[in-house]
A protein has these predicted regions:
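Feature activates predominantly on carbohydrate-active enzymes
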Residues: 40-43, 52-60, 64, 68, ...
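Acidic, His- and aromatic-enriched active-site or binding-groove loops in soluble protein domains
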Residues: 281-297, 325-342, 419-427
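Short, well-ordered secondary-structure micro-motifs within conserved domains or adaptor modules
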Residues: 74-96
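Acidic, Ser/Thr/Pro
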Residues: 577-825
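Catalytic domains of carbohydrate-active enzymes that cleave complex glycans
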Residues: 413, 420-651
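Aromatic-lined carbohydrate-recognition surfaces of secreted/lumenal glycan-active proteins
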Residues: 292-317, 357-363, 398-400
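Structured mid-domain segments that build the active-site/substrate or prosthetic-cofactor binding neighborhood
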Residues: 232, 236-240, 337, 343-454
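Sec-dependent signal peptide recognition
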Residues: 15-23
């Protein structure tokens, strides 16, 4: 039905009535009443809008209600609230309240009123969510539209988002075929922003806008090795700071609708080396000084406008100066310098800045290649923990770089939208996940719950034939449970995703001509499934060939080449029989493991009661990178743990490596000792004092610069190496592990070459460079002894024996229950 064209924006009588209605909605304590929207396929209420700007969302509401009930809902414009009423006359609560809305049913009407048209749009999709509509992933396949010819609603809510900006965006961008459905998914899940916070690298843009000024004033540029040059400023120069402040004022004058401007440094190094800049302090202090000056000038002329800046790379460490109240610092969860953990970084910035944002990395195709559980966006525990924690730490803006890969990460992205709006939803993850499984898969929810557990990065599964075999078998089981047409379409999408994982596994494991052939098969396949959004086709096509020089695209097959002439691009679609064949062949070709993983306790104790023999001492590799835990034991307290540390082995510019000591007996799980290792490639004595006995965790965090930790021979010192807690060993290493009595199979996963030695030092298995599971029988009488990995590269994840590695028996810690049980035998 066409909309009424009467213009209502200037009708003062209507505005007064709506304001009175809002007063009643926000102040009344009366209980909401049930309202009937439709009965037996007949609409009982019209949709009424108070503002012409609400026409698009009114049309969407009418369309969706028709799909749900079968009824045609008339759309009217009126000065008097009635029916399903949409209004924007909300009390003005400022920039932070642009998305606030209220929904209330009662007196035969349903009222949706918001601060802005944007807020009313949120209210409409919230109402539809409460009715049962879901848009789990982008596109019609992943819509869930309930069938309710008779529709009743009872609701009384006032909503405001916990994060003012909620962006889940795709690095590398979207295919044109995916842009509209992705935007639709964001809107339908309230994953849009009331405030636009700009925080990207900006120094280069300033230089471009004022090219003549910089040419006339080279002293505005950074002094590097005696030469004034881009891409950084000489921030100590007051004239430069005035220029940048004027630049900001000019931008706001040009576009008064701007909420913010970014003055984040250009990427990489090149910071000024002049004496005056050195006096200011760190790269962070310099960048923040400039942002503060800009904010001071902008606030005077344009109150309430924001200046955005990242805490990223060389300017990620916390500053020594406070941020201006209108400077919003978005802390990046990757590319952290200075050896800080994310927790330390947040605490440091929270102490200096009024408002924080988070620059997240839910999925970066270069890192995770759309594989199961490989990205943060597919790690439900990470999302459940971090989104409310960041908010508690002062974050009010969330920008999450992601990928258009709803195969591995779709459930995580969907749950993230719920938590970004309301962090309390983190407590409801299980019920939200069950809602997803019930509505998306119906009778097939049981096998699909198991399928999604394989995708969950909380307990990531190694990429292997076993994983593929289990995925295919669960899909086959789900398809056999009488799925309806809508559910079958979703299962088909996930079958195509599983086929992608299979093809990628074959490609990644191949060499020579076989690798090129597997690469071609992979790329031809991903183009055929591009509209499903299961994998990020644009990112793979643009990035993978540039990273892997052992393969090549043929002539005219680059991403930028026209689709019509690209020999690897086809518009064909897979048939139902072809998809069924993928599943059948996958079950046949991908064999399952012959062992069950065993869970061991986390309370470790010395293995001395087992009276294990002396063995040649091994080694733990050449260095560590990132964060690694060492486990040690204090027999008698107080004690001093003495180690030797060398940092900056690979990158000497990442700041000090940090060493923290955590006794497990400390009630609040706090560190009791801290040491920082300068990145000078020199040996430094580390002394960590503790007043606690028993098990201690030594955490070393070095920002991936490369750090070597050494300890005296015979000191209890063990590494845990499981899929949940990888040891992250570098170089060739030789470490021992214990095979408990009664063990029949040593099972696990290997990521590189090396040898497995039995208790007498005999090689019983040779590991290949290709990642994969291993299953080694334990001969009679060889259990209850030390085995070892020798000349090993990459990680070994132990799954049927305790995942505890040490240089010899004297340094080995084992799960308490294993020692107690085997010592009695």
């Amino acid at each position: 039905m066409p909309l009424c064209e009467t213009h209502l924006g200037s009708d003062q009588r209507m505005r007064g009535m709506i304001r009175a209605l809002i007063f009643l909605l926000t102040c009344s304590s009366l209980r909401a009443e049930s309202v009937i929207l439709a009965k037996e396929g007949r609409a009982l209420l019209p949709i009424v809008l108070s503002d012409d700007r609400l026409k698009p969302v009114a049309n969407e509401l009418a369309t969706m209600l028709r799909r749900i009930t079968g009824a045609e809902f008339a759309i009217q414009s009126s000065v008097e609230p009635h029916g399903i009423f949409l209004g924007v006359e909300f009390p003005d609560r400022g920039i932070n309240a642009r998305e606030d809305y209220t929904i209330r049913s009662g007196k035969g009407q349903v009222t949706l009123v918001g601060q802005t048209p944007h807020a009313v749009e949120h209210a409409v999709w919230d109402l539809l969510y409460r009715i049962g509509f879901r848009q789990f992933f982008p596109g019609r396949t992943w819509e869930v539209v309930p069938h309710s010819p008779s529709l009743i609603i009872e609701v009384d809510v006032s909503e405001s988002p916990d994060y003012h900006a909620r962006k889940i965006w795709a690095g590398f961008g979207h295919l044109k075929e995916r842009e509209a459905v992705y935007g639709e998914w964001n809107r339908r899940n309230r994953a849009t922003s009331g405030i636009t916070l700009n925080s990207g690298h900006s120094y280069g843009a300033v230089m471009s806008r004022h090219e003549a000024t910089f040419a006339a004033h080279p002293e505005f540029l950074a002094l590097v090795e005696g030469k004034r040059q881009k891409p950084k400023f000489c921030i100590a120069n007051a004239g430069l700071r005035n220029l940048v402040a004027d630049d900001a004022l000019a931008q706001f004058a040009k576009d008064p609708t701007l909420d913010s401007i970014s003055y984040d440094p250009s990427d990489g190094g090149g910071w000024c080396e002049c004496a005056e800049c050195r006096k200011i302090g760190s790269a962070t202090d310099r960048a923040l000084l400039l942002a503060n000056d800009v904010a001071e000038a902008v606030t005077a002329a344009y109150p309430g406008r924001l200046i955005g800046m990242y805490a990223y790379n060389e300017h990620s460490p916390p500053p020594s100066i406070a941020a201006h109240p209108n400077v919003v610092i978005s802390v990046a969860t990757g590319f952290i310098r200075g050896g800080y953990t994310m927790e330390q970084l947040l605490a440091g910035w929270q102490a200096k800045a009024k408002t924080l944002g988070i620059r997240e990395y839910y999925s970066v195709n270069t890192w995770d290649r759309d594989l199961p559980g490989a990205a943060r966006g597919g790690n439900l525990e990470y999302l459940r923990t971090t989104i409310p924690h960041f908010h508690q730490s002062g974050a009010r803006f969330m920008s999450a770089e992601s990928s258009d890969n709803f195969g591995p990460n779709g459930l995580g992205y969907y749950l993230a939208t719920r938590m970004m709006w309301d962090v309390k939803e983190a407590k409801n993850i299980d019920s939200l996940t069950n809602d997803f499984l019930d509505k998306a898969f119906g009778a097939a929810r049981a096998p699909m719950a198991k399928f999604y557990s394989l995708l969950d990065g909380t307990k990531r599964q190694a990429l292997s034939d076993d994983l593929l075999g289990r995925m295919y078998r669960l899909l086959d089981e789900a398809r056999g449970l009488g799925a309806d047409e809508a559910t079958q379409a979703r299962l088909d999408d996930l079958a195509l995703y599983t086929r992608y994982v299979e093809l990628y596994h074959d490609y990644a494991s191949a060499q020579g001509k076989e690798r090129q052939a597997a690469f071609e098969q992979l790329f031809r396949f991903i183009w055929l499934i591009r509209q499903s959004g299961m994998v990020h086709v644009k990112a793979l096509w643009r990035d993978l060939p540039n990273r892997d020089r052992s393969v090549a695209l043929p002539e005219l097959a680059r991403y930028s080449d026209p689709d019509a002439t690209n020999p690897w691009k086809s518009d064909e679609a897979f048939t139902a029989e072809q998809i069924s064949a993928f599943i059948r062949d996958g079950m046949t070709n991908r064999k399952l493991l012959d062992f069950e993983p065993i869970a061991f306790g986390s309370k470790l104790v010395p293995a001395t009661e087992l009276k294990l023999p002396e063995v040649p001492r091994g080694n733990a590799g050449i260095y560590l990178r990132g964060v690694r835990d060492f486990w040690t034991w204090i027999e008698k307290q107080p004690a001093t743990i003495t180690l030797t540390g060398k940092a900056g082995i690979i990158y000497p510019t990442c700041g000090h490596a940090k060493v923290d000591l955590y006794p497990l007996a400390e009630a609040e799980s706090k560190a009791v000792a801290h040491f920082e290792i300068p990145p000078d490639k020199a040996d430094h004595v580390i002394e960590l004092k503790t007043a606690f006995p028993g098990l201690h965790r030594i955490e070393v965090s070095d920002g991936t610069q490369g750090t070597l930790i050494s300890w005296p021979d015979g000191m209890p010192m063990t590494l845990v190496s499981s899929q949940e807690q990888p040891a992250k060993l570098f170089g060739r290493w030789h470490l021992y592990f214990y095979v408990p009595k009664g063990t029949k199979i040593i099972g696990g996963f290997s990521e590189g070459g090396g040898f497995l030695l039995d208790p007498v030092g005999k090689t019983v298995h040779t590991f290949l460079d290709k990642p994969g599971y291993f299953s080694i029988p334990v001969p009679h009488g060889e259990d209850g002894k030390l085995w070892s990995f020798k000349h090993s590269a990459g990680n070994r994840f132990l799954m049927t024996v305790p995942p505890c590695l040490a240089r010899d028996a004297s340094e080995l810690l084992l799960p308490e229950e294993v020692v107690a049980k085997d010592a009695r035998r």
